[in-house]
Design a protein with these regions (language model features):
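Bulky hydrophobic segments
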Residues: 1-159, 178-198
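Individual transmembrane alpha-helices with interfacial aromatic-anchor signatures
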Residues: 160-172
Length: 198
């Protein structure tokens, strides 16, 4: 029986259908202003898209093990596609040169997490220092990698690569986003705190 997956676009669409009305309802319930509502909506859409990109396409029953040829070049299970040595993957890529595909993935990982460095301090005062937002970035990135490994174990095959270098790159992306936040904070409303709607 052939493998089936939940496609990325379908997962994102389903997530948006559930999330957007929920955010709007919560905003109406809390009587927040239009600015905070806009920021919350943007953050919710970003999270749905990010989760969709990180975890889909996802195998759904009935599935089959990946064909052997798809495992070529990787360490065999049960030591799956996991790298716990910092800068190993980055170092190999730099030594042998980045091709277009690798460069696109690298830049994509940075840009994918950059909005997190904007939204966290914008929505929550506790994340408005570089140390705090960096700590959050490390925690979130580690959680993503650990979840990918756990799902691979449950599925019986590694459907995602888990790499400590992804954590490093993601943190760089959040730091970039935080720098952008510091710049745009000069022109945006001072604090999108919850205020009763007028």
């Amino acid at each position: 029986m052939s493998a089936q997956t939940l496609p990325t676009d379908t997962a994102i669409l389903l997530g948006l259908v559930v999330t957007i009305p929920l955010v709007l309802w919560l905003g109406w319930r809390d009587r927040i202003g239009w600015w905070l509502m806009l920021v919350r909506l943007a953050f919710a859409v970003y999270l749905v898209v990010l989760i969709g990109l990180l975890f889909t396409p996802f195998p759904i029953p009935p599935w089959t093990r990946l064909p052997e040829e798809s495992l070529m070049g990787y360490r065999p299970w049960p030591y799956p596609w996991v790298n716990i040595v910092p800068f190993e993957t980055i170092g190999v890529a730099l030594r042998f040169g980045l091709d277009w595909q690798e460069g696109r993935v690298l830049v994509g990982n940075v840009l994918a997490f950059a909005p997190l460095g904007i939204f966290l301090p914008l929505l929550w005062p506790r994340w408005r220092s570089l140390v705090a937002v960096t700590g959050a970035a490390v925690g979130i990135s580690l959680a993503v990698e650990i979840t990918q490994v756990a799902l691979s174990v449950l599925l019986g095959f590694p459907y995602r690569v888990a790499d400590i270098d992804d954590v490093i790159i993601n943190v760089l992306g959040v730091a970039l986003g935080y720098a952008i936040y510091r710049a745009i904070a000069l022109v945006l409303p001072p604090d999108p705190a919850v205020q009763p709607a007028s």
